[in-house]
Amino acid sequence: MYTLKEGIDFYIEPMQSKKVTVFDTTLRDGEQTPGVSLTSTQKLEIAHQLDKLGVDIIEAGFPISSEGDKESVKSISNAGLDTTVCGLARVLKKDIDACFESDVGLVHTFVPTSDVQRIYTIKKSREEVIQLAVEAVQYIKDHGLKCMFSAMDATRTDPEYLIEVFKAVQEAGCDIINVPDTVGVMVPSAMYRQIKGIAAEITIPIDVHCHNDFGLAVANSLMAVEAGASQVQVTINGIGERAGNADLSQTVMSLTSIYGAKTNIRTEYLVETSKMVENYTGIRLPPNTPVVGQNAFSHESGIHSQGVLEKSDTFEPGIMTPEMVGHRRRIVLGKHTGKHAVKQSLESAGIKTNDNQLDEIVIRIKEIANKGKQITDADLYAVASAVLGKASSEEELIKLKEVSVMTGNILTPTAVVKADIEGKEIIAARTGVGPVDAALHAVRDILGESNHFRLQDFRIDAITGGADALADVYIGLENEKGRIVTARSANPDIVMASVEALVNAMNLLYKKENKS
């Protein structure tokens, strides 16, 4: 057990002295995500962003796959980036030549080594596979470039044969070997044992490439580093073939924040980079995506949000803050929200309330949330404005009790309003050109002869998107003396929002007349 931050202990072995190289394959394996096709311009922009992020190696593409891909890799190679640009190649001279023509600084060559892939895809014997691998490595090294060799489907390859392959390419001059979990079948404990066994036999650096078919890509990558790997292959947002690859943000933040390892990643650009790739690929992240997702540092529960507001370490990792990854902390308002969070959110916007007003705002927020509505900041401020704009209960002339409306294509819109006026229950019914018009006429009628005002302003805004948008109604009333008051109300029901706004305005007018 060791401590990275005071009061927070971790039951793992630390890696403060270990440096891990980050190999990003978003532009190669990531682009193989079903439905994703990036333009050359987009790939170049992503490459610049990855360089800004600080990745050590960018696998820019598979040059032999198409002339367009080769030109894209070449443009990235010649973009003046600080990172090393890599091209993928099978153990074939034509593939490797395409990498040379793309001006890459590293060639990543591969060949299947598992029996199932070797027999059914390339139809070669074990001996022939070793010969192809060695010849490819030698060809790359003879041209003065760095070489990484991948034993494709390594995690389903006979362990003794795999070591034999790696020893052969190491002797041929390979700079680094890659152990790919090509179909994502490893579990962390098995990954640890495999990498530990390879590290005991091989002296050159070990890289891992983990797929996420069972959701274990990040965990397997971390176990590989624990066992001796010094380089991890990752993609932005975990995109890639099938279920994707190890996610860069999750892998890097786990390595640096939990293990204490070092990388060259400038973590403050993680969210920015994630959003760029999200926009260009069209693959939207679930809100609960770790590190970079919308909810990664969001809190709704009253207990959680109050704890975070007092001290963020209470219900956040503590060793990873939103600022570290370019994110921001959000207190999300909803049906689980407590008064503390609502008060904090209001005060951050300069809105002060007394206890009664705060109680009513919380009640309204929860009423809206219980209808399945997500509460935004705009919703909160509209609700707060409606509550703060009301007269206090003891100064209310009108206490609204009930509103009902009928409308349809063969019905005349009709509204019935029930309210208490100075302790007396009044009911009024009116028709109108629509349900809102009918309801407002009915509200005015409940005052009878005391109805000495005119509607000076009336505005309705949908302050949030969607069919369930919150209606924000603003009303201006003017009495016979020229006194003007304004009031507003917010409600998912546009009729109720309109009625509440008018009643609020009428009560404010009554309050001001009594105090004048």
UniProtKB/Swiss-Prot annotation:
PROSITE patterns: AIPM_HOMOCIT_SYNTH_1 (PS00815), AIPM_HOMOCIT_SYNTH_2 (PS00816), PYR_CT (PS50991)
Signal peptide: none
Catalytic activity: 3-methyl-2-oxobutanoate + acetyl-CoA + H2O = (2S)-2-isopropylmalate + CoA + H(+)
Highest taxon of the lineage: Archaea
Example of a GO MF term: 2-isopropylmalate synthase activity
SMART domains per UniProt: LeuA_dimer (SM00917)
Matches recorded under InterPro entries: 2-IPM_HCS-like (IPR050073), 2-isopropylmalate_synth_dimer (IPR013709), AIPM/Hcit_synth_CS (IPR002034), Aldolase_TIM (IPR013785), LEU1_arch (IPR011830), LeuA/HCS_post-cat (IPR054691), LeuA_allosteric_dom_sf (IPR036230), PYR_CT (IPR000891)
The protein's annotated pathway: Amino-acid biosynthesis; L-leucine biosynthesis; L-leucine from 3-methyl-2-oxobutanoate: step 1/4
The entry's keywords: Amino-acid biosynthesis, Branched-chain amino acid biosynthesis, Leucine biosynthesis, Transferase
Keyword Protein transport: no
Domain Pyruvate carboxyltransferase, first and last residues per copy: 20-271
Pfam families in the record: HCS_D2 (PF22617), HMGL-like (PF00682), LeuA_dimer (PF08502)
Enzyme Commission code: 2.3.3.13
UniProt-listed GO biological process terms: coenzyme B biosynthetic process; L-leucine biosynthetic process
Family: Belongs to the alpha-IPM synthase/homocitrate synthase family.
Biological role: Catalyzes the condensation of the acetyl group of acetyl-CoA with 3-methyl-2-oxobutanoate (2-oxoisovalerate) to form 3-carboxy-3-hydroxy-4-methylpentanoate (2-isopropylmalate).
Protein name as annotated: Probable 2-isopropylmalate synthase
Organism: Methanosarcina mazei (strain ATCC BAA-159 / DSM 3647 / Goe1 / Go1 / JCM 11833 / OCM 88)
Gene name for this UniProt entry: leuA
